[in-house]
UniProtKB/Swiss-Prot annotation:
Belongs to the AAA ATPase family. GO terms for molecular function: ATP binding; ATP hydrolysis activity; preribosome binding; RNA binding. There is a cross-link at residue 208 (Glycyl lysine isopeptide (Lys-Gly) (interchain with G-Cter in SUMO2)). Residues 205-218 have a biased composition (Basic and acidic residues). Residues 114-124, 133-158 have a biased composition (Polar residues). GO terms for biological process: positive regulation of protein binding; positive regulation of telomere maintenance; regulation of protein localization to nucleolus; ribosomal large subunit biogenesis; ribosome biogenesis; rRNA processing; telomerase holoenzyme complex assembly. A motif (Nucleolar localization signal) lies at residues 49-52. InterPro entries: AAA+_ATPase, AAA_ATPase_domain, AAA_lid_3, ATPase_AAA_core, ATPase_AAA_CS, NLV2_N_sf, NVL2_nucleolin-bd, P-loop_NTPase. The modification N6-acetyllysine is found at residues 70, 156. Residues 1-220 are annotated as: Interaction with RPL5. Changing residue 173 to A: Abolishes binding to MTREX. It comes from Homo sapiens (Human). This is Nuclear valosin-containing protein-like.
Length: 856
C-alpha cells in the first residue's frame, strides 16, 4: 500500500503565513495563537467564520511544514557551501604544490600532513617486512606504494622494484618529494644513501630539495615565534588585568586621609556657629580633661542646612584648624550590591579611623544611607543604619585616647533615623541657615579677599541686593562678575583700537575684517563677529592694558541677572525692588507694620528691656487689589530680612500627613534663617473656620499651624504676616493674641490716597509722560473712581497709555510727521469707558461692615 499523505495543505494559507513571517510583525519568536488571530483579522473574508481552535491547528500544521522546508533548504545551502569550500581548498592546494609557495595562513588553517604520510609508509613497510605474503599487491596498492615511497627519477633510469624501498627503508626516514593531492608529501629514502653513498641518484633536484627544507624550517620557526609572541602578549594582558584588580581592591580596601588647608577665617558670616564649634572641639585637644572628669566626650556632629550654605567647608575648616587628617567619604560610596559588603565597608571605615586616631570622619549626604527604618524599602538600608549605630557606640567603648570625631552633613535632617540623633551619636546638631544681610556682607568680604576690587567698594550695598543668597551663590556671583569685567575691558580695548587703528598690541580686528569682506551685517552679526575676533586673537594682554582691570560694583549688578539663588528654589522670594516709595498712601498701615516688624529688628535691646519677646503677627485684610502683598514685600525689603512667601493652597497635599509636614518644614526653614518673615497669601484657604462636622485634612493643617505659631517651642525672630480677602471665614483661634494678634484693614483708598497712588504709578507724571491738560487731582476726585482700588488705578493709567500709543500709530500710518508721545486728558476719558471697578457697591458695603467688626 502507498503511504498515507500528510494531509491537504492550503497553498494560499501557506503563502499568507510566509508573507506574515517575512513582514517581521511577529518579531523573533512566533506565537501560533497570535499568528492565527492576526490572519483571521486581516483576512476576515476567508477565515473570519472559521472556528478559532480548528484554524489554529491548521496554521500550526502549515507553520511546521514551512519550518521543515526552511531547515532542509538551510541544510542544502550549507552542504553546497561546504562542497564549494572543499573545491576551492583543493584548487589552492594544487596551486601550492605546483608553485611551492610558502603561505603562513595556510599553515595555520590546515595541519601539516607530513607526519601522517610518514606513519602510513612506516607501518606499511613494517607490515610488509613481517608478513610479505599476506599482503596482496593490488594495482591500487602498488600505485600508492610507488607514489609514496619511490624517489622521483628521470625516464632514463626506469623504475625501481617495490621490494627495494622496503629493504632500504629499514631504520630510515622518508621525505616524499613526489607531488600528490596534499602538499608537502615528499619522501626520500635516506637509507639508500647510507647503504650506498657512492650511488648517484639520477637528476635529483638537490637545490630544490634544500630550498624546500629551508623554507619548511623557516615556516615552522615563524609559527613558533608567532605562538611565543601571542603567549607573551596574553601573559602581559593577564598580568595587567591582575594588577588592575589588585589596585582596585587596594583602593576599595581603605580610603586615603586628606590634609585640609581651610581655616575658620575662610568661613565667613557664621561667627556664632564657629563659637559653638570651638566649645565643642575642646576634647580633641585636651582629652585628659574629660577623662579626669569621667565624662564621655561628644563623638558626632550633624551639620544641616540648605544646599550651598557651607557644610562641607565647615567640616574641612574644623580639620584644618585642629590640624587633623580628615577621612572624607560620600554616603553612596558605602552602598554595595553584594549582601553584607556595605556593612563591611562601614566597619573597615571606623577601624581605619581608630587605628589612625586622632582624626575626623566626614560622611557627606548621610541621609542617603540612614533613612528611617520604619519606612525603609529594603532590608539593606535597615542593616546599614544598624551597623552605623553600632560603630558609633563602639567609639564610646574605646578608650578616651582614641580621639575620633564623626561629622555628618545633610540637607534633610528630618529624614534621618531618630536613633542616630540621640545622645552619644549625632547629639550635636549645627544648623547653617540662609545668611542675613550682615552675614552676606562678611561672606562677600571673605570671598573677595583675593579679587582685584576698587578701593571704595560698597559691600553693604551688594549684600542688600542679594537676599536669599547662600555662600555658593555668592561665589558664583563673584565668578560671573569677573567674567563681566573681562568682557567689559576687552570691549573697551576694541573701542580704543577703532579710534587708534595703528595700535598693534591690542586685539586686532584687521583679520576679522578680512574674513568678513564687504558684506553688510546686522547688529547681532557685528556683535558675534566682534566676540569671535576676541576668541581668535591669541596675543596676551600687556601689563599696561591690564593695569586698570578690576571688578567694579556695576559688574556685580550685571551678574545678578544671571545668578539664581538657591533659596529661591527652596521657597524664599527675593524682593530687591519693592520699597515704601513704590506704595502710595497707606501711611497709618505703614506705621503699624514698622512698629510690629521693623522696630524689633532695629531696636532689639529696647524691646527686650520692656519684656516684648514674642514677635507679633499681622493679618492684612481687605478687598483684592488694595496692595496687601505689596506691603508685605516692602516690609521685608526695608527691614533686610529673609522673606518666605507661602501661597495658601500650595501646602495642601492629598496624602495623609504631607500637608502638616509642609507646614512644619516652612517654620523650620524660617527658624534656621532667622530673622525671617513668613508671608501667608490667601490664608483663608489654609485656615478655614473649623466646625464639629469637619474631621479632615484641613482641620489637621489648622491645628498644626496653631501649634507652630504659638506652641511649646518659641519662635524667635520669626515674624508672621498673612493676607486675606475674607477674614470672616478664618478660624478664630488664628486671630488671638500671640498668633495673628494685629489685624490691619487695607480698604478702598479715599480721594487723597488715590491721588498719592496715581502720582506713584506715573512717577509724578514722568512715566508715562502726561500732557499739560491732565489733572491727576481731578481724576482722583472723580466720582467714577469711588470704588477703584490701587490695581484699578494702575489699569486706568495703562489703558490711557495704550490709547495714546494707538493714536500715535494711526498718525504715522496716515503719513503725518511723528509727534511727541504723551498721555492727554481725552485718553483718560477713553480709559474710563473701558476700565470698570473690581469692587461692586454690594461688596463695598460688605467690606465696610467687616471693617467695623474688626475695629471693635
Amino acid at each position: 500500500m502507498k503511504p498515507r499523505p500528510a494531509g491537504f495543505v492550503d497553498n494560499k494559507l501557506k503563502q499568507r503565513v510566509i508573507q506574515y513571517l517575512t513582514s517581521n510583525k511577529c518579531g523573533k519568536y512566533v506565537d501560533i495563537g497570535v499568528l492565527a488571530s492576526d490572519l483571521q483579522r486581516v483576512y476576515s473574508i476567508d477565515y473570519g467564520r472559521r472556528k478559532r481552535n480548528a484554524f489554529r491547528i491548521q496554521v500550526e500544521k502549515v507553520f511546521s511544514i514551512i519550518s521543515s522546508e526552511k531547515e532542509l533548504k538551510n541544510l542544502t545551502e550549507l552542504e553546497d557551501e561546504h562542497l564549494a569550500k572543499r573545491a576551492r581548498q583543493g584548487e589552492e592546494d594544487n596551486e601550492y604544490t605546483e608553485s611551492y609557495s610558502d603561505d603562513d595562513s595556510s599553515m595555520e588553517d590546515y595541519p601539516d600532513p607530513q607526519s601522517a604520510n610518514h606513519m602510513n609508509s612506516s607501518l606499511l613497510s613494517l607490515y610488509r617486512k613481517g608478513n610479505p605474503d599476506s599482503v596482496s599487491n593490488t594495482p591500487e596498492m602498488e600505485q600508492r606504494e610507488t607514489t609514496s615511497s619511490t624517489p622521483r627519477i628521470s625516464s632514463k633510469t626506469g623504475s625501481i622494484p617495490l621490494k627495494t624501498p622496503a629493504k632500504d627503508s629499514e631504520g630510515g626516514w622518508f621525505i616524499d618529494k613526489t607531488p600528490s593531492v596534499k602538499k608537502d608529501s615528499f619522501f626520500l629514502d635516506l637509507s639508500c644513501e647510507k647503504s650506498n653513498p657512492k650511488k648517484p641518484i639520477t637528476e635529483i633536484q638537490d637545490s630544490k630539495d634544500s630550498s624546500l627544507l629551508e623554507s619548511d624550517m623557516k615556516r615552522k620557526g615563524k609559527l613558533k615565534n608567532k605562538g611565543s609572541k601571542r603567549k607573551k602578549e596574553d601573559l602581559q594582558e593577564v598580568d595587567g588585568e591582575i594588577e588592575a584588580v589588585l589596585q582596585k581592591k587596594a583602593k576599595a580596601r581603605g580610603l586615603e586621609f586628606q590634609i585640609s588647608n581651610v581655616k575658620f577665617e575662610d568661613v565667613g558670616g557664621n561667627d556664632m556657629t564657629l563659637k559653638e564649634v570651638c566649645k565643642m572641639l575642646i576634647h580633641m585637644r585636651h582629652p585628659e580633661v574629660y577623662h579626669h572628669l569621667g565624662v564621655v566626650p561628644p563623638r558626632g556632629v550633624l551639620l544641616h542646612g540648605p544646599p550651598g550654605c557651607g557644610k562641607t567647608l565647615l567640616a574641612h575648616a574644623i580639620a584644618g584648624e585642629l590640624d587633623l587628617p580628615i577621612l572624607k567619604v560620600a554616603a553612596p560610596e558605602i552602598v554595595s550590591g553584594v549582601s553584607g559588603e556595605s556593612e563591611q565597608k562601614l566597619r573597615e571605615l571606623f577601624e581605619q579611623a581608630v587605628s589612625n586616631a586622632p582624626c575626623i570622619i566626614f560622611i557627606d549626604e548621610i541621609d542617603a544611607i540612614t533613612p528611617k527604618r520604619e519606612v525603609a524599602s529594603k532590608d539593606m538600608e535597615r542593616r546599614i543604619v544598624a551597623q552605623l549605630l553600632t560603630c558609633m557606640d563602639d567609639l564610646n567603648n574605646v578608650a578616651a585616647t582614641a580621639r575620633v570625631l564623626v561629622i555628618g552633613a545633610t540637607n534633610r535632617p528630618d529624614s534621618l533615623d531618630p536613633a542616630l540623633r540621640r545622645a552619644g551619636r549625632f547629639d550635636r546638631e549645627i544648623c547653617l541657615g540662609i545668611p542675613d544681610e550682615a552675614s552676606r556682607e562678611r561672606i562677600l568680604q571673605t570671598l573677595c579677599r583675593k579679587l582685584r576690587l576698587p578701593q571704595a567698594f560698597d559691600f553693604c550695598h551688594l549684600a542688600h541686593l542679594t537676599p536669599g543668597f547662600v555662600g555658593a551663590d555668592l561665589m558664583a556671583l563673584c565668578r560671573e562678575a569677573a567674567m563681566c569685567a573681562v568682557n567689559r575691558v576687552l570691549m573697551k580695548l576694541q573701542e580704543q583700537q577703532k579710534k587708534n587703528p595703528e595700535m598693534e598690541d591690542l586685539p586686532s580686528k584687521g583679520v576679522q575684517e578680512e574674513r568678513l569682506g564687504t558684506e553688510p551685517t546686522s547688529e547681532t552679526q557685528d556683535e558675534l563677529q566682534r566676540l569671535l575676533g576676541l576668541l581668535r586673537d591669541q596675543d596676551p594682554l600687556s601689563e599696561e592694558q591690564m593695569q586698570g582691570l578690576c571688578i567694579e560694583l556695576n559688574d556685580f549688578i550685571v551678574a545678578l541677572s544671571s545668578v539664581q539663588p538657591s533659596a529661591k528654589r527652596e521657597g524664599f522670594v527675593t524682593v530687591p525692588n519693592v520699597t515704601w516709595a513704590d506704595i502710595g498712601a497707606l501711611e497709618d498701615i505703614r506705621e503699624e507694620l514698622t512698629m510690629a516688624i521693623l522696630a524689633p529688628v532695629r531696636n532689639p535691646d529696647q524691646f527686650k528691656a520692656l519684656g516684648l519677646v514674642t514677635p507679633a503677627g499681622v493679618l492684612l485684610a481687605g478687598p483684592p487689589g488694595c496692595g496687601k502683598t505689596l506691603l508685605a514685600k516692602a516690609v521685608a525689603n526695608e527691614s533686610g530680612l529673609n522673606f518666605i512667601s507661602v501661597k495658601g493652597p500650595e501646602l495642601l497635599n492629598m496624602y495623609v500627613g504631607e500637608s502638616e509636614r509642609a507646614v512644619r518644614q516652612v517654620f523650620q526653614r524660617a527658624k534656621n534663617s532667622a530673622p525671617c518673615v513668613i508671608f501667608f497669601d490667601e490664608v483663608d484657604a489654609l485656615c478655614p473656620r473649623r466646625s464639629d462636622r469637619e474631621t479632615g485634612a484641613s482641620v489637621r493643617v489648622v491645628n498644626q499651624l496653631l501649634t507652630e505659631m504659638d506652641g511649646l517651642e518659641a519662635r524667635q525672630q520669626v515674624f508672621i504676616m498673612a493676607a486675606t480677602n475674607r477674614p470672616d471665614i478664618i478660624d478664630p483661634a488664628i486671630l488671638r493674641p500671640g498668633r495673628l494678634d494685629k489685624t490691619l484693614f487695607v480698604g478702598l483708598p479715599p480721594p487723597a490716597d488715590r491721588l498719592a497712588i496715581l502720582k506713584t504709578i506715573t512717577k509724578n507724571g514722568t512715566k508715562p509722560p502726561l500732557d499739560a491738560d491732565v489733572n491727576l487731582e481731578a481724576i482722583a476726585g472723580d466720582l467714577r473712581c469711588d470704588c477703584y482700588t490701587g490695581a484699578d488705578l494702575s489699569a486706568l493709567v495703562r489703558e490711557a497709555s495704550i490709547c495714546a500709543l494707538r493714536q500715535e500709530m494711526a498718525r504715522q500710518k496716515s503719513g503725518n510727521e511723528k509727534g511727541e508721545l504723551k498721555v492727554s486728558h481725552k485718553h483718560f476719558e477713553e480709559a474710563f469707558k473701558k476700565v470698570r471697578s473690581s469692587i461692586s457697591k454690594k461688596d463695598q458695603i460688605m467690606y465696610e461692615r467687616l471693617q467695623e467688626s474688626l475695629s471693635r
